[in-house]
A protein has these predicted regions:
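C-terminal single-pass membrane-anchor helix
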Residues: 234-289
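Solvent-exposed, non-transmembrane regions of membrane-associated and secreted proteins
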Residues: 1-243, 271-274, 278
C-alpha cells in the first residue's frame, strides 16, 4: 500500500524538488549579481547595451524540428564580433534572467540556448531570436519542456489566455508583457515567431500534445510600459515557489498508518502465539472396542 502511494506521489515530489532547485538557482544568480564587479551600474548598462546592439544586428529566424521536444535556432547574427553565450552572462552559468508568469505558477530561470541540459534546468532562450531586453522591432522566443515526470516547467502553458501578464527580469530591468495571442502551429510555421516592425514581443513556446510533440503552443505577448510597480517588485523578490509540500504530509500519514497496522498485527500474532495448546487427556484418547 505504502509503495503504491509513493508511486502516485512521485511526480508531485519530483516537481517540488525541481522547483526548489530552480528557485535556488535564481537566488544564487542574484547573489552573484550583487557581488563586485557585477553589481556595478556601468557593467550592467554595458551588458544591456551589448544585448541591444546584438538584437539590432540580428537576422531573426528559427526552425522547429518536428517530433522533437526542443526548438533549435536557425537564425544568425550579421557579421559581428558578438559572442552569444557571453552576452548578459554576468552571473555565470549561462544565466540570463528570470521569467515569472504568476497565473500559471511559473517562476523560472532563463538560460542561453535550448540544449537538453539547459531545458532540464529551466527556460531556454532560442538563439537566433532577439535577446529578452525589449525594444521596438524585437521578438524574444523563450522555450521550455512540458510533461517531464521530474519537473514542472511550461506544463500549464496550454492554459494561457489573452490578457494574461508575465514579466521578464534581466539585470536591472523588469519588462512586463500582456498576452495578445495563443495559437498551436506546425513546427515549420516559423513566420509565427518572426520579429514584427514597431512591436516589442516575447513568445513562449512548448510542445503539444503531451508525449507526441508534433505541434507547438505559441503564447505571444506585447510589452506594457511602464512596468507596473507590483510586477517589478514581484519580479525581483525572493521566489515563493515551491509551495508547502502537501505530498509529504500524505506520505507521512500513510507511513504512520502502515507502521501502526504492522505493529498491531504483530501484537495480535504474538498474543495468539502465547496461548499454550492443551495436552489431550486420557479421556480424550480414541480407543478401539
Amino acid at each position: 500500500m505504502f509503495g503504491g502511494i509513493a508511486i502516485i506521489l512521485y511526480p508531485q515530489a519530483a516537481s517540488w524538488f525541481s522547483q526548489r532547485e530552480q528557485s535556488r538557482a535564481i537566488e544564487a544568480a542574484q547573489a552573484r549579481l550583487d557581488e563586485p564587479p557585477n553589481n556595478s551600474s556601468d557593467a550592467r548598462r554595458a551588458q544591456l547595451a551589448l544585448a541591444h546592439a546584438y538584437n539590432d544586428a540580428l537576422a531573426s529566424g528559427a526552425i522547429f524540428e518536428a517530433n522533437a521536444n526542443i526548438a533549435t535556432g536557425g537564425g544568425s547574427g550579421a557579421d559581428s564580433p558578438f559572442v552569444y553565450e557571453e552576452i548578459l552572462d554576468l552571473a555565470g552559468g549561462g544565466f540570463m534572467g528570470r521569467l515569472r508568469y504568476d497565473s500559471l505558477g511559473i517562476d523560472l530561470p532563463i538560460y542561453h540556448g535550448t540544449s537538453d541540459e539547459t531545458l532540464e534546468r529551466g527556460v531556454g532562450h532560442l538563439e537566433g531570436t532577439s535577446l529578452p531586453v525589449g525594444g521596438v522591432g524585437t521578438r524574444s522566443v523563450l522555450t521550455a519542456h512540458r510533461g517531464l515526470p521530474e519537473a514542472t516547467l511550461f506544463d500549464n502553458l496550454n492554459q494561457s489566455e489573452v490578457g494574461d501578464s508575465f514579466t521578464v527580469a534581466v539585470l536591472d530591468q523588469v519588462l512586463a508583457y500582456e498576452v495578445i495571442d495563443v495559437q498551436v502551429v506546425e513546427p515549420d510555421q516559423t513566420q509565427a515567431i518572426l520579429a514584427v516592425e514597431d512591436r516589442d514581443l516575447v513568445t513562449l513556446v512548448t510542445c503539444t500534445p503531451l508525449g507526441i510533440n508534433s505541434h507547438r503552443i505559441l503564447v505571444t505577448a506585447e510589452r506594457v510600459t511602464p512596468t507596473p510597480v507590483e510586477d517589478a517588485e514581484a519580479a525581483t523578490a525572493v521566489p515563493d515557489i515551491p509551495k508547502f509540500p502537501w505530498w509529504s504530509v500524505i506520505l507521512a500519514v500513510s507511513f504512520i498508518a502502515l507502521a501502526t497496522f504492522v505493529w498491531r498485527s504483530g501484537i495480535v500474532r504474538t498474543d495468539g502465539a502465547g496461548e499454550a495448546t492443551p495436552e489431550p487427556s486420557e479421556s480424550d484418547e480414541i480407543t478401539d472396542h
